[in-house]
């Protein structure tokens, strides 16, 4: 167990119990760290040092200036929850999964390392809009999780290649072959 000692004067509890007045009188700064079983147990403080500490604490608890800010600067407006249609509904262009979608997907057995990209969401929405099926919001999220899982795993977890890119030939000649 790590600990921080806040004074350079360290004594054992036996010494403090034997003559605490002498120990505190010899201390620098009016404070002594008391150890029991080679571990810090508590601090012994002189009455004068305790008065200093209490005065300092009281001073720090008062505001540094008499300028008070309006309460509006401290109060943040509550975010209006996104309206999720009740019951079953057909997919629509502005549909979004919940903010904690990744956590929910993990509960359904779909571990998504990264959040759903805008492209994945757009492809999902476009497909299901054309289908015209109706499901509950949670069912749409489950379908999205499975869809993303399947699309990501179909390429070995790698992002899909751009079909418009021109591939570069490998010009490296292995050892033992003539080029």
Curated annotation (Swiss-Prot):
Gene3D superfamilies, sorted: 1.10.8.1180
Signal peptide boundaries: none
Keywords of the record: DNA replication, Primosome
GO cellular component, one term: primosome complex
UniProt region (Disordered), positions on chain: 151-179
Listed GO biological process terms: DNA replication, synthesis of primer
Annotated region described as C-terminus, given as residue ranges: 84-155
InterPro entries cross-referenced by the UniProt entry: DnaT, DnaT_DNA_bind
Positions with biased composition (Polar residues): 151-168
Summary of the function given for this chain in its UniProt record: Involved in the restart of stalled replication forks, which reloads the replicative helicase on sites other than the origin of replication. Can function in multiple replication restart pathways. Displaces ssDNA from a PriB-ssDNA complex. Probably forms a spiral filament on ssDNA.
Free-text note regarding domains: The C-terminus (CT, residues 84-155) forms a 3-helix bundle.
Subunit structure: Homooligomerizes. Interacts with PriB. Component of the replication restart primosome. Primosome assembly occurs via a 'hand-off' mechanism. PriA binds to replication forks, subsequently PriB then DnaT bind; DnaT then displaces ssDNA to generate the helicase loading substrate.
NCBIfam families (UniProt xref): PRK02854.1 (NF002770)
Family, as annotated: Belongs to the DnaT family.
Protein name: Replication restart protein DnaT
């Amino acid at each position: 167990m790590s600990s921080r000692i806040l004074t350079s004067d360290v004594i054992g509890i036996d010494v403090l119990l034997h003559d605490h007045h002498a120990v505190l009188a010899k201390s620098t700064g009016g404070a002594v760290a008391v150890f029991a079983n080679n571990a810090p147990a508590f601090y012994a403080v002189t009455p004068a040092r305790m008065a200093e500490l209490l005065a300092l604490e009281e001073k720090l608890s008062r505001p540094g200036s008499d300028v008070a800010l309006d309460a509006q600067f401290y109060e943040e407006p509550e975010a209006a929850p996104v309206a999720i249609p009740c019951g079953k509904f057909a997919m629509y262009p502005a549909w979004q999964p919940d903010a904690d979608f990744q956590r929910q997907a993990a509960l359904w057995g779909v571990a998504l390392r990264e959040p759903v990209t805008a492209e994945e969401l757009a492809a999902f929405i476009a497909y299901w809009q054309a289908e015209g099926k109706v499901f509950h919001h949670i069912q749409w999220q489950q379908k999205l999780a499975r869809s993303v899982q399947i699309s990501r795993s179909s390429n070995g977890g790698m992002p899909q290649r751009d079909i418009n890119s021109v591939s570069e030939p490998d010009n490296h000649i292995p050892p033992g072959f003539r080029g």
